Amino acid sequence: MSLDKFKIAMQYAMPKHFISRVVGKLAAAKAGVLTTTLIKLFIKQYKVDMSEAKHPDPAHYESFNEFFTRPLKDGARPIVADSDIIIHPVDGAISQLGDIVDGQLIQAKGHDYSLQALLGGNKDDTTPFLGGKFATIYLAPKDYHRIHMPIDGTLSKMIYVPGDLFSVNPLTAQNVPNLFARNERVVAIFETEIGPLAMVLVGATIVASIETIWAGTVTPPAGSDVFSWNYPTKGENAISLKKGEEMGRFKLGSTVVLAWGDDKADILDDQLPETVTRLGTPFAKIDD
């Protein structure tokens, strides 16, 4: 058995939810010098660029979770002001992107998966995105872990979808069928200038928590059923966010999937699989 096949076999065999929750408790622990030492080791191992952090000193962070969700310095990620430009919502790397064809998204070469399954199984939630565009962006452990709005939007719905917690690195994307539609995830649907925009925050092994700025921690605890929440898009209780504003965060890296409808915006020609993304830089252009 090759090393890659062994790694995939271990992904299926290990108790991923249990491991992730244990890691989550450890990441939340405030252990003083021990926490600082482990953060320093993490920075060295993953080559984290702390010069961009608002607080570059590892001793500033009382827990791993504070370090994982560290804010950046003011001005570290300028947001493109052009109203016709949709920006990258995260630091990371594009895994796949392109057209949504027959309700399917590309996971990796030779592997497609269902948009309807990704969004929680509701056909009505899926219909607005058929024939549209999608992009999958992977956040590595070294990356900035907050997720921001790629365009102005007003929240209309949030969906929690229970699932597994496979790793979401390129190896598993190439070898685990329906990876993003089988992992635990949080779906946020926004009303925007280009129509509905879906932002799917996908959980993974040792991703201890997925949070949104309006609901706080959505997971853990892990559930066994799909839950959805509808939000008003008008009036004083509407949750409206500007392009570049934070909408959520991962406690450790994972994956974000974006989707929008047909003929609304075109992904820029220089955006390709493996393209490194930086929050605030151009990703797509709204059609005239």
Swiss-Prot record:
Tell me a GO cellular component.
plasma membrane
Q: How is it modified after translation?
A: Is synthesized initially as an inactive proenzyme. Formation of the active enzyme involves a self-maturation process in which the active site pyruvoyl group is generated from an internal serine residue via an autocatalytic post-translational modification. Two non-identical subunits are generated from the proenzyme in this reaction, and the pyruvate is formed at the N-terminus of the alpha chain, which is derived from the carboxyl end of the proenzyme.
Pathway(s) this gene product operates in, as recorded in its UniProt entry: Phospholipid metabolism; phosphatidylethanolamine biosynthesis; phosphatidylethanolamine from CDP-diacylglycerol: step 2/2
Q: What GO annotations for molecular function exist for this entry? A: phosphatidylserine decarboxylase activity
Q: Which InterPro entries match?
A: PS_Dcarbxylase (IPR003817), PSD-B (IPR033177), PSD_type1_pro (IPR033178)
**Active site residues according to the UniProt entry:** D91, H148, S254
EC number(s)? 4.1.1.65
Q: In its UniProt entry, what is this protein called?
A: Phosphatidylserine decarboxylase proenzyme
Tell me which species this is from.
Pseudoalteromonas translucida (strain TAC 125)
Q: Which gene encodes it?
A: psd
